């Protein structure tokens, strides 16, 4: 991506380009007659969702002490999404995507709190610098400075592509792990079910049925 890129010494500009390059593109297109081709339209729906876009955290973990940081005392506003994997379209025409392999972005993952340290290790985070060295330019990627920041990733995200002013959401009710996809299916009895796999080694496929209330 960058000529003569030095992985051990990226520049701040390169890091910021990396932040902008992560996430999702919402692109407005139109059909070209019956050719099967699509034409890009420069309409109001086009936008980027990146590693610096504000998300709203919802569900049981939202607002808990585990997701509060120095930049977000509420624990309900998350900056960005990372390493987005497969997803799907919901019956209400929004898009889901899983945050996968987010461990690679965080540095100095060694804490005195035993429970917190076990969580970091469970997700594969280690002491020392991160692969991308983003912690040099934004302290939220340094676990020794922001120990709860990793807890704000590893969720299913939901984006409304038809409302460019909408704030994307992270759903904590669907569990935190290395989400391989987040796909919706409506069962024969009308129950909405979300399917997602944990992309860690030797892990599981999860189903999350709605309570129908």
Question: Which role does the model predict for each range below?
Answer:
Residues 24-29, 152-161:
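Beta-propeller blade signature
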Residues 107, 202-205:
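Structural motif
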Residues 78-90, 176-187:
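Beta-rich, blade/repeat-based domains predominating
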Residues 206-213:
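Conserved small/polar residues in nucleotide/adenosyl-binding loops
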Residues 1, 95-96, 191-196:
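Conserved beta-propeller blade signature
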Residues 34-75, 157-176:
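Blade-edge beta-strand/turn elements of extracellular beta-propeller
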Residues 12-53, 84, 88-141:
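Carboxylate/His-rich catalytic cores and anion/metal-binding grooves
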């Amino acid at each position: 991506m960058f000529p003569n890129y030095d992985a051990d010494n990226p520049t701040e500009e390169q890091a910021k380009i990396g932040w902008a390059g992560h996430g999702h593109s919402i692109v407005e297109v139109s059909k070209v007659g019956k050719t099967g081709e699509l034409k890009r339209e420069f309409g109001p729906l086009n936008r980027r969702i990146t590693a610096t876009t504000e998300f709203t955290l919802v569900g049981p973990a939202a607002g808990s002490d585990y997701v509060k940081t120095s930049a977000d005392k509420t624990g309900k506003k998350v900056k960005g999404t990372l390493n987005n994997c497969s997803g799907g379209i919901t019956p209400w025409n929004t898009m889901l995507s899983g945050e996968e392999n987010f461990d690679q972005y965080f540095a100095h993952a060694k804490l005195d709190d035993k429970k917190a340290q076990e969580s970091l290790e469970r997700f594969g985070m280690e002491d020392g610098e991160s692969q991308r060295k983003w912690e040099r330019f934004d302290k939220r990627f340094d676990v020794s400075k922001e120990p709860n920041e990793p807890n704000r990733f590893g969720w299913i995200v939901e984006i409304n592509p038809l409302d460019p002013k909408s704030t994307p959401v992270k759903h904590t009710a669907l569990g935190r792990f290395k989400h391989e996809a987040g796909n919706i299916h409506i069962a024969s009895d009308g129950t909405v079910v979300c399917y997602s796999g944990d992309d860690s080694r030797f892990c599981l496929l999860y189903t999350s049925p709605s309570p129908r209330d």
